[in-house]
Design a protein with these regions (language model features):
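Structural signal for interior beta-strand "rungs" in well-ordered beta-sheet cores
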Residues: 1-84
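Long, leucine- and charge-enriched amphipathic alpha-helices
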Residues: 83-120
Length: 120
């Protein structure tokens, strides 16, 4: 754990990990073995990092991000699995629309089926 890094409560750091200087690991972060966390990286609450992953210097992972692969330096990622923040935000916005979209697709499928029956 590098000089100046802050480790909050209930953080688990696996074997053979390296946490750079001035990194911040917020509550309930879990880091699997052999990971590299760059200097000044921020892992918000409940972030989970798979084994042998590298988090670049200054990268930010928002709360509850699931990290299966390397994160480039200086980027902000979120989601499960994690992805660049702009993409994660679009997915989160679309999730709210899914119930209405499913209803609409079902209605359209019924109408299409009815039209195909009439045509036959």
């Amino acid at each position: 754990i590098g000089r100046g890094s802050k480790v909050d409560n209930l953080v688990q750091v696996g074997h053979n990990c390296d946490v750079g200087e001035d990194a911040i690991l917020v509550a309930q972060v879990g880091i699997s073995g052999s990971c590299r966390i760059g200097s000044r990286a921020i892992l918000a609450g409940q972030v989970g990092v798979a084994d042998h992953v590298t988090i670049g210097e200054g990268a930010i992972l928002v709360a509850q991000a699931g990290v299966p692969s390397d994160i480039p330096a200086g980027e902000v990622w979120g989601g499960m699995p994690s992805r660049p923040m702009a993409e994660a935000r679009r997915i989160w916005a679309a999730e709210r629309l899914l119930p209405a979209l499913v209803r609409r697709v079902r209605t359209l499928e019924k109408r299409l089926e009815e039209l195909e029956r009439r045509r036959a």
